[in-house]
């Protein structure tokens, strides 16, 4: 049954929200102030599929990507920039308010820069043996085949062509391939997962494809297939050779912005701990000013940091350790010598480590987060432990999505 709905607000996932039916009804791709026609979505009683915009919002703009609305990569290309920025900042404000945290939230910083420098493509042969390579569809496990994505860093030029070639060679049926592609200074770094055991002849074929597409490196489940040139990224003064499948911030400008915000708040700190350090996007920059202790559960990432730090001139000592901070967080006695601690955990946050920090006497804590909800939970622990949350700075590197980064400053 087709319904006519008035959209009252924009939800936290970028959906239009209608409150006219006695409860919240979510309509993807609709905007506040619009009157729309929509139909029910089977199995989702509170969701509707947008059929037509009868009365458009003055804030509506034409999406710039032909795949928008079908591809699940972007949620909100159809909103003017100013209200988009307001909505995204409000995601942080509202999440903190729901947790009972009242703190100044700065204006949103745009850190999209040149675009995304790492992507994960999916590939699978489906009906009639047709191969699809692309991103997941909106709210679905279907694959949307694409040959171009306008939000990618130019360093990923050739990524889609290489992914198609690899998928054609591996002919995935049933379970899809995951093809992670990262832009590096020496070319594309690709790690393929989901292929299962391969005969030597296929490994040779993949090596030839890597040569043809001039990949820096090709790995399969992190095992080397071909190394043409080291996949290197610049982090501050350092050059880091990435381990296969390494985590990086989504954009180069995003990483730089987060690091510069953190460094600006560290003042004259001489001993700094960088927790959940990864390959060192903070540690290698912090070491320009202070001695750094860094740790993370990702042993290959820590090894990459350990190699890069002593090879970079002008840095103070960096000690790095592989350690699972979810199971073995640094305890107050281990934290007592630090002037400042920075932590940048995955989306699940750092509850165990935040509890230990709350019991410590570290005078300055900088939190970096990609999930406002888990940040709010961890921030409450620090506040209850005597820290004052001074400010929160939202950073937008996942542009056109509901995801937002933030940097927060705590003092005791």
From Swiss-Prot:
Residues making up the signal peptide according to the UniProt record: none
Domain of life: Bacteria
Family of this protein: Belongs to the class I-like SAM-binding methyltransferase superfamily. RNA M5U methyltransferase family.
Name of this protein: Uncharacterized RNA methyltransferase RPA0948
InterPro entries: MeTrfase_TrmA_AS, NA-bd_OB-fold, SAM-dependent_MTases_sf, U5_MeTrfase_fam
Gene Ontology terms for molecular function: 4 iron, 4 sulfur cluster binding; metal ion binding; rRNA (uridine-C5-)-methyltransferase activity
Keywords of the record: 4Fe-4S, Iron, Iron-sulfur, Metal-binding, Methyltransferase, S-adenosyl-L-methionine, Transferase
Lineage: Bacteria, Pseudomonadati, Pseudomonadota, Alphaproteobacteria, Hyphomicrobiales
Binding site for S-adenosyl-L-methionine: 249, 276, 296, 344
Annotated catalytic residues: 370 (nucleophile)
EC number: 2.1.1.-
Cystine connections: none
CDD domains tied to this protein: AdoMet_MTases
GO BP field: rRNA base methylation
Catalytic EC class: transferase
Membrane-spanning segments: none
Annotated residues for binding of [4Fe-4S] cluster: 65, 71, 74, 149
